[in-house]
Design a protein with these regions (language model features):
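Gram-negative bacterial Sec-dependent N-terminal signal peptides
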Residues: 2-24
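A broad, structure-centric signal for solvent-exposed, well-ordered loop/edge residues
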Residues: 8, 12, 45, 60-61, ...
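N-terminal, post-signal peptide beta-strand-biased segments of exported outer-membrane/organellar beta-barrel
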Residues: 20-145, 150
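Outer-membrane beta-barrel porins/channels
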Residues: 25-36, 129-436
């Protein structure tokens, strides 16, 4: 059996078990592919609709003005320690036993096989004058397979030895969420006789659309052969009576609400620029637990018989560990400081330092980031970008380009990130007017 197929099936099955939970530094998605193209190193240079989520002060700087992005989208996916590139090596062929053994050793050493998938969509991002408006939806799902579950996927219930063995699924996790944010940004120019300077503020209103947190237990017993699994899950659901049991009413997309404030500063003197921003200076977002349910789902399969249960219950019955996980899913403050130099009229280099003030909370980006980027505009209709950064426990590198056809821009970027969030591949595409 092909291991890459089994692993994919396992990830899909876990996703189906319940919506997931990961984490984000700012609730508005990055609408600009330029930001990813320079690896996020544009706090001092960002303009137009890209400034709304990065540094709102850029809206009052020269080069902003009108800009419009048409449904820009960013996707991300990753596996760790067995990576997407590891699986790609065996696309369409059987994975040798020795390779599966090595993979399982890596998973055992890491403690789990982690997977992540997500998408950020900006329904619109618009700037005019010193004002910016954006609405975006962020969806993220991650899971962790413990070594026992990974062994079952790679080798079946016989295990790696070929003889039936007890395999534990304890430690299986599936976390996911979706939220939508509307943001209003204002850039405020500051008077100066020697440079261009501005302050900026963004006010965000976030709605939690869906949430799911699940923790797995049980496993496979060898003698007698038996599959006994449990899944304690909290998820978006209003519990209703349904026949002899309970069920869920239609999903309420207003599963949590909150308001956040971001601040920014930017200065440009001759060829040198400075920028700083703090996202979530204040953020009141929290999930509405009245719109969550708990299920102690279980399934038992023995020779000739089976039994399962998955009826939802009131959230109040959830274990304390799941309630704590829900309470922790909030937005934490993040600071970004950047500098840039226009080496020439067509070439700009920039550097950034980012740090989130907490290890907890929603985190789609690394806690720490120190990097540099560059943009070259000397090819007329083609603008090129690249960047790299040292991040928490790893590195990130990226590249991108824009095809500039008068006011119309077609922009794309890609990045690879390794670190505390595993190995993640990111891609971004945007059709825009007036900015990139």
């Amino acid at each position: 059996m092909r291991s890459e197929f089994l692993l994919s099936v396992a990830l899909v099955a876990l996703n189906a078990a319940g919506p997931m939970t990961t984490a984000a530094s700012a609730q508005l998605a990055n609408a600009s592919a330029s930001t990813l193209g320079v690896s996020g190193n544009n706090t001092a240079t960002v303009r137009g609709f890209g400034a709304i989520s990065v540094n709102p002060a850029g809206l009052a700087m020269p080069g902003s003005g009108f800009s419009l992005a048409i449904v820009p989208i960013q996707v991300r996916a990753g596996l760790d320690p067995i990576t997407l590139s590891d699986l790609a090596e065996f696309d369409g062929v059987l994975v040798p036993t020795a390779t599966k053994e090595a993979w399982l050793d890596e998973i055992t050493a890491a403690g789990a096989q982690a997977g992540l998938v997500g998408v950020d969509i900006s329904e619109f991002a618009l700037t005019f004058g010193n004002i910016g408006l954006q609405m975006s939806t962020v969806i993220s799902i991650d899971e962790n397979l413990p070594p026992g579950a990974a062994e079952a996927i790679l080798f079946g219930n016989a295990g790696r030895t070929g003889s039936a063995a007890n395999l534990s699924f304890d430690g299986t996790t599936v976390d996911g969420f979706a939220f939508t944010t509307a943001g209003l940004s204002v850039g405020i120019p500051l008077e100066s006789s020697t440079s261009d300077m501005a302050l900026g503020v963004t006010v965000n209103y976030t709605v939690g659309n869906a949430l799911g947190i699940a923790r797995g237990t049980g496993g496979i017993l060898a003698d007698p052969v038996e599959l006994d699994v449990g899944l304690a899950a909290v998820f978006s659901c209003e519990v209703i009576s349904e026949g002899d049991g309970t069920g869920c009413d239609d999903l309420d997309p207003m599963g949590g609400t909150g308001v956040g404030f971001d601040l920014g500063f930017m200065m440009k003197q001759d060829r040198f620029s400075l920028g700083a921003s703090v996202s979530n200076v204040v953020n009141t977002f929290e999930w509405d637990t009245d719109k969550l349910a708990y299920t102690p789902a279980s399934a038992e399969f023995k020779l000739g018989e089976s039994e399962s249960s998955a009826d939802p219950e009131a959230y109040s019955g959830a274990p304390a560990s799941l309630k704590t996980a829900v309470a922790d899913l909030t937005f934490k403050p993040t600071i970004q400081i950047g500098a840039a130099l226009d080496v020439s009229n067509d070439f700009t280099v920039s550097g950034d330092l980012h740090n989130r003030f907490s290890d907890d909370g929603i985190r789609l980006s690394p806690k720490f980031h120190l990097g540099a980027g560059a943009e070259f505009r000397g090819l007329g209709i083609l603008h090129l970008r690249g960047g790299a950064a040292v991040i928490t426990d790893g590195i990130q590198y990226s590249g991108g380009a824009s095809l500039v056809l008068g006011p119309v821009n077609l922009s794309a970027a890609a990045a690879v990130r390794t670190g505390d969030l595993g190995e993640v591949v990111l891609g971004h595409f945007a059709l825009s007017f007036g900015n990139r």
